[in-house]
Amino acid sequence: MNIIKLKNTAIKLEEQLVIYSKIDPEAIALYSDLKPLLEKAKDGSILKSIEVGEVPGRYRFTERNLQQYGELEEAYAIFSIEVTGGETLALKLFRESMLGKS
């Protein structure tokens, strides 16, 4: 796990949460769910990856309509990838193959 990359993704996600918390109460709830994990990521105290299911809040995108905010969803996805161990080889190859098709 890349601690610096994790910290940067936590900061970017927090920035998006602050923006969308001003317009959607569901974003406030997501921020509340994620705040302890974001704080640990920003201060460098997460030393090993967590399980995918342990990242709070995914259901808020699929069931609570936060997917309408693309920048927030992308920041959440990137943070989730980093906190769960970073981009896997399979994901990297998939992304590269998709870039080659565009």
Regions found by a protein language model. Give the residues of each.
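Short, well-ordered alpha-helical segments
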Residues: 25-30, 46-55
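Short terminal alpha-helical segments
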Residues: 1-33, 101
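Phosphate-binding glycine-rich loops and adjacent basic patches that engage nucleotide phosphates
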Residues: 1-2, 35-44
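Amphipathic alpha-helical binding modules
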Residues: 54-102
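Generic structural concept
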Residues: 7-10, 14, 31-38, 55-59, ...
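Secondary-structure edge/capping motif, primarily at the C-terminal ends of alpha-helices
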Residues: 16-21, 41-48
